Amino acid sequence: MTSIEPTHTGKKVIVGMSGGVDSSVSAYLLMQQGYQVEGLFMKNWEEDDNNEYCAAAEDLKDAQAVCDKLGIKLHTVNFAAEYWDNVFEYFLAEYKAGRTPNPDIMCNKEIKFKAFLEFADEILDADYIAMGHYVRRRDNSDGSTQMLRGVDGNKDQSYFLYTLSHEQVARSLFPVGELEKHEVREIAKEMGLITHDKKDSTGICFIGERKFTEFLGTYLPAQPGNIETPEGEVIGTHQGLMYHTLGQRKGLGIGGMKNSNDDPWYVVDKDLERNVLIVGQGGHHPRLMSTGMTVNQLHWVDRTGPVDGCHIAVKTRYRQQDVPCTLTYTDEHTLGVVFDEPVAAVTPGQSAVFYDGEVCLGGGIIDQLIRG
């Protein structure tokens, strides 16, 4: 492996150590660059079953093993109260209102780059924080800092970080954003880090791998109702609108319908007033397609957003191909977006994130869909 010439001697970085390979390699790379590195493990959820407790304990054990191997300190902190108040209650309120939120985005905003940064500043006297996210930062000659997509297009996580402020980006380092995932695993293996072959975590941010329906049902009462076609024919029942999202195909329990073709059924709409789930056949059903949307709760990383009438790219969900679009401001908090071509399964409550080439500009929450 090519050694990196140390260039940042003395600057202190607190790395969010999750017990995964990305944060492990981030800590190693920053040490190679000459930073004074310490780790911080966050506990953000009070586990309520043995499986979750064991998984969290395993993550902490792995984080400690990596820090021991690298010869750095590992601190721990409990942000469970902040997570509940600022992330989880929002998550439940959105589901209750019939929308589909993205808790990972709120978790990054409120916990990883707010509570974590404040703790690193006030308690650990950090110059920077670092996370194992696949994004990059660019420091421009005019003093501004921009957030760029990660080099690994399949792992790029800028969609989840669009709510970061200019100041938060300027205080954060993202070492693995310059690498492909396979390179990160190779570095971890070469360094003998225990996390080199640990599988990536999935599931809700910090809550972990659970059966989502059961988990949500413990916090929100389910309200069963009918499943109907767009024409109003009742063809089944659902256990609760909150368990379904636009474009969903699996788990509908519909099949073998008389007088219907073999095309799969998709969720194409929700009627909140009647508690009815509306389904149609085919992934490009007209009710599933949108020609545009309104976006509110706008946030721009570099403080000033794109100009009115500009033509840029948007993602309405993670890992989606860029969608070319034109923007029109209704006011400073709301944006009208018209897609160049209709887009399937645009979902209220999810985030719309805008890009100018490699630069993540910011985004907002999808509010209303424009159809036809």
UniProtKB/Swiss-Prot annotation:
GO terms for cellular component: cytoplasm. The active site is at C107, C205. It comes from the Bacteria. One of its GO terms (biological process) is tRNA wobble position uridine thiolation. It catalyses: S-sulfanyl-L-cysteinyl-[protein] + uridine(34) in tRNA + AH2 + ATP = 2-thiouridine(34) in tRNA + L-cysteinyl-[protein] + A + AMP + diphosphate + H(+). GO terms for molecular function: ATP binding; tRNA binding; tRNA-uridine 2-sulfurtransferase activity. Residues 155-157, 317-318 are annotated as: Interaction with tRNA. Keywords: ATP-binding, Cytoplasm, Disulfide bond, Nucleotide-binding, RNA-binding, Transferase, tRNA processing, tRNA-binding. This is tRNA-specific 2-thiouridylase MnmA. It comes from Shewanella baltica (strain OS155 / ATCC BAA-1091). The gene is mnmA.
